[in-house]
């Protein structure tokens, strides 16, 4: 009897070692996401008769605020990892080793997408007000690139051996080195590749959003803001399920891996965002009907 056995294994966190400078996969993937996102957003901006240069203008502040928000969100809920003996970490730069506060070491992993969304949204709101751009239309232009960036960025978790799920023996199981396993699962070798689940789910959302974007000017059903609401609904739906598999959740009133006695923060936020998306679509439809009634009246 032939038994198929296979598993996924990270080759390591280093993408390129130049001797004087080490480039990690996490940073490389973020850079790739930014470049692709810039290209996609400019294309979508042209389709809505919005100056593509606005995308280039907002990019620096969007990146900075998103990273700050994502890191701050994670550090706040995982402060025990960045305090006491872990307050500082080593950074090799030009053949020198320096000590920096560990909460600044974003390249080592430890960011939360919900925090990044909050930071990015604040940047977008300020930019749209300063440029007098329609907020909902501009967010609809950026959202497809954001979810595509999330899809690409999730692979950073793979290379860092982090954000994996509970033990499994499925054919697509992920091997995790013993030093990266939670104490509760120290004797298990294979885990759910939740990074892969979320990456694939996010890419499907990207395709859906692009489809809706191309239909947006052809029907009143997809008003400005619809794509943003659809993103909140679809992403939150998938994230809620995937989060339930993970062994490293940010917890409220509990401890990983199962947040016993508490709740998983990402699932709580997902419920809120899912509901917000539904409410948003309801009001968009209500406004559409109101406009039609005024025209017919």
From Swiss-Prot:
GO terms for biological process, alphabetical: lipoprotein biosynthetic process
Positions with a binding annotation for a 1,2-diacyl-sn-glycero-3-phospho-(1'-sn-glycerol): 154
Transmembrane segments: 20-40, 50-70, 105-125, 133-153, 193-213, 225-245, 266-286
Record flagged with keyword Transmembrane: yes
Membrane topology: Multi-pass membrane protein
Molecular function GO labels: phosphatidylglycerol-prolipoprotein diacylglyceryl transferase activity
Signal sequence annotation: none
Domain of life from the UniProt record: Bacteria
Pathway assigned in UniProt: Protein modification; lipoprotein biosynthesis (diacylglyceryl transfer)
Cited Pfam families: LGT
Keyword Acetylation: no
One cellular component (GO) term of this entry: plasma membrane
PROSITE patterns found in the cross-reference section: LGT
Subcellular location: Cell inner membrane
Keyword line: Cell inner membrane, Cell membrane, Membrane, Transferase, Transmembrane, Transmembrane helix
EC numbers for this chain: 2.5.1.145
Family statement: Belongs to the Lgt family.
UniProt-listed HAMAP family: Lgt
Physiological role: Catalyzes the transfer of the diacylglyceryl group from phosphatidylglycerol to the sulfhydryl group of the N-terminal cysteine of a prolipoprotein, the first step in the formation of mature lipoproteins.
Protein name (Swiss-Prot/TrEMBL): Phosphatidylglycerol--prolipoprotein diacylglyceryl transferase
Lineage: Bacteria, Bacillati, Cyanobacteriota, Cyanophyceae, Synechococcales
Gene (UniProt): lgt
